[in-house]
């Protein structure tokens, strides 16, 4: 009997040791994965659209881009990363602050930030992987605006502080809404875009509660029609059922919660799952920012009027807008 118990003990010990080893290996793998870039430099070349304008704005702009990084005293932020047009010309560029999705850092998506900067933006991100509260986005904006005033900074005088956009995905969508509504510097933002922002109850339960009624700047909200974004039950006010990350019902509710004097637009990418939203919204997200931050009239034609490009694009559905 003692021998049997000894064998059982050894087996259990081996199982525990194996579990520990697997946990360590998985932790190491995660750490390594978190420090690498997840998408190829030319990821945007795979994008297809029936809309010539969407295809155009999903690609590269005309500017060569330079990248900078700065250490942050905030451990959640870790590093602040900036991409901007590398030109000798003495001019200013609008800013776009990007708010990360869950467990994602700017480090992981460098090519996406660089592509956006090639359209004439100073694109700013950080390596915070839990961004829903919006606080680190707010802090990151303050940091880069201080660089604009620092004569020793490469960004000195390069930032147009009158035109600042905010872009957020998933948890970062909630974070973007909070960034433009909750903080002392929230009034500096002048345009907002979200890709599959987590619905209000989900955000509240996770500690990222937001209030869309406080949004006072042009807002383009998007989501996918796939089951990861919309589980098909519309139960956005129940804790008993998961409705998906960003179901249509939540877009409708958020859209209706914003006052009519604010330019607002909601739309869904046909067939898109939650994880597809960054690259499948690139074109129209870029155009939205070009329109509102640079006054680009061609980009505006995608969104404004009865003949707006988004209304006839088969890749988009459930479009509602008030301009």
Residue ranges and their predicted role:
Residues 35-91:
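N-terminal cap/lid segment of alpha/beta-hydrolase-fold proteins
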Residues 90-101:
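Short beta-strand element of the alpha/beta-hydrolase
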Residues 1-20:
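N-terminal Sec-pathway targeting helices
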Residues 2, 29, 33, 270-323:
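Alpha/beta-hydrolase-fold serine-hydrolase catalytic core, especially in secreted/extracellular enzymes
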